[in-house]
Amino acid sequence: SIPQNCLPYISMVLHTCNQNHFYHDAVFFTLFTNKKKGLCMIQLEHISKKFKKKAVLNDISYTFEAGKIYGIYGINGSGKTMLLRIISGLVFPTSGSIIINGKTLHKEISFPDHMGLIIENMELQPQLTAFENLEELNKINHYATTSDIQDALRKINLQSNEKVKKFSLGMKQKLNIAQAIFENPQLLLLDEPTNALDTDTIGCLKAILEDLKKKNCCIIIATHDHQNITSLCDRILEMKEGNLYDKN
């Protein structure tokens, strides 16, 4: 179900994972981005997803607009992560359409080139510094400058010259966030971004998201952490048993 024009990039990422044998619980990886200042609007039209006879998502219709932060909360298994995978184009819906800036993804089999994408169990390279980890990711598309990398690490308050093998879980999570933002995506999808973060770092994350919002980035966060998501997001949605409810 992965779009063909996405496969070379996925292959490079997976090759890096296999070479280093070091995995982390979650990563927020900017797979495709560009420097164009276009707006990103996502329209979900009657999205349903089934595995065999089990319904995972039920007839979801919603529009996500540029320049806003959306929070989707729900318990494990509610369907929130599956919805993010479908929006990213890595999984196609059983029925319905995903339209990004007027292009229907599952019909045209095109992959957005301005997306910060979640990849579960993506590795960090322990023998490298935080800066070097971002440099390695930048080799995939070469959109970021040295200044972009340094700025992302500064915003999340992470030392650029310390090796990842010395990192605590919270520091690794900080690096995951830096990986998501250093190429300035127009669409950013985050799964459980506040995991292992202290209060100060959650404050840094909020400032980062507010900055991206001012640049008209469309940000969608999936989490079970209702308390922190309320302070981070403009609009709150609840995912329950495959149904999406607007709580505003």
Residue ranges of model-derived segments:
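Conserved ABC transporter NBD signature motif
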Residues: 96-111
